[in-house]
Amino acid sequence: MKQQLVFEAPRRAMPPQHLADLDETARAAAVTELGLPAFRAKQLANQYYGRLIADPQQMTDLPAAVRDQVAEKLFPTLINPVREIQCDAGETRKTLWRAIDGSTFESVLMRYPQRNTVCISSQAGCGMACPFCATGQGGLQRNLTTAEILEQVRAASSTMRAEHFGRTAGTAGGGRLSNIVFMGMGEPLANYNRVLGAVRRIIAAPPNGFGISARSVTVSTVGLAPAIRKLADERLGVTLALSLHAPDDELRDTLVPVNNRWKVSEVLDAARYYADTTGRRVSIEYALIRDVNDQPWRADLLGKKLHGALGPLAHVNVIPLNPTPGSEWDASPKPAEREFVKRVRERGVSCTVRDTRGREIAAACGQLAAEG
C-alpha cells in the first residue's frame, strides 16, 4: 500500500520526563522540587553528559538516601536495546531500541580510522513516504522526545569509551564518539523542537551537554523549506544535509513526496539561506537509482542548479541505492555512477560517492525499518 505524506505525528502518550529533556534552568527547578540543594543539578548533569552515567545508583557523589528518588523522577529507563547486530568486521553496529510504549527505532554506530560516527533516529518511523526508503514505507509511529534522542548518543558514547575498539590512544578515532548524524529513522525537521533541544545538548560543553563540535553534527531533511530557514536562524553551525535525489520537480514529486509541497527551487533557496546565514557548506544527498535518476542529463541539470543556487557551498554525496525488501529499484552500475559524478563536477560542483556502511545488516541509508 502506498504511504501518504504525514507531517503531524499521531497523538500518543509521551514517556516520563528525563533529566536530558531539561535545560539548565529546568534542571535546577526539578532538583529543587525534589527537596535537594540546587548544586545537585550540576552534579547530575555532569554525571550524565560528562561521565555518561544514567543510573543514580552509580553516582557516588549523590547521597545514597536520595538515589532511588532521583532515579524515579529524573532518570526513568526510556529505551532498551532489543537486538544488536554487526558487520564490517565489527566496525558497524546496528541497535534496535524499544521505548516504554513499545515504539521501536534504530541507531547505527560506525567506526572509521579517523572518526567514530553514530547515526541516530529522531522519530519512530517516518511520515515522508519516500518510495525507495524502507523507513518511509513503514509509516510514522510518533516523534521521539529529546531524551530518547540523546539516549542514543549517550549509549554510543558510552560504548566507545568502554571498548576503545582496539584503536591506538590519541588517534582521532580512538575511544571517543566524534560525529553525530541525524540520518536514522524519521524527518528531523518534522520533530523540530525536540531535535533542536537534542542538538543544543549535544554541542554544549559539559555539564550542559556532550561537548561535540557543531561542525561534527549533521541534520538531514527531505526539504521542509520553512524549517530549514528556521534552523538557519538558530545559528548553531551544524551541517545541513538535503536529501534531494532528483533535480527536476517531475521526478522529485514521486521520489520525495514532500516536493509536492515545496518544489526544488524553493528548497534550494532555503538551502542557500542556510549556507549564507551559517557560513556552512550544504551536503546534497543523491541516492543513485538505475534508469530512474542516473541519466547524464539529470547529472548536468543537478550540477547546473546547484552551481547557480549554492556555488562552492554545495557538496554532492552520491549514494548507491541500498536494497530494501520488495523494492523494484536497484543501484546504478558503476560506469553510470562514475559518469554521473564526472558530469556534476564538470559543472563546478564538488561531488563524491559515499562510503556505504552496514548494507549487509540493513543499516545503510534508507534501510532502517526497526524490524524486531
From Swiss-Prot:
Q: Carries keyword Secreted? A: no
- Provide the residue positions that the database annotates as binding S-adenosyl-L-methionine: G186, E187, S220, S243, L244, H245, N322
Record the organism: Mycolicibacterium smegmatis (strain ATCC 700084 / mc(2)155)
Cystine bridges? C119-C365
State one molecular function term (GO): rRNA binding
- What family is this protein classified in? Belongs to the radical SAM superfamily. RlmN family.
Protein name (record) = Probable dual-specificity RNA methyltransferase RlmN
The prosthetic group or cofactor this protein requires is:
[4Fe-4S] cluster
Top-level lineage group: Bacteria
The miscellaneous comment for this protein is: Reaction proceeds by a ping-pong mechanism involving intermediate methylation of a conserved cysteine residue.
Q: Which InterPro entries match?
A: Aldolase_TIM, Methyltransferase_A, RNA_MTrfase_RlmN, rRNA_lsu_MTrfase_RlmN/Cfr, rSAM
PANTHER family reported for this sequence: 23S RRNA METHYLTRANSFERASE, RADICAL SAM CORE DOMAIN-CONTAINING PROTEIN
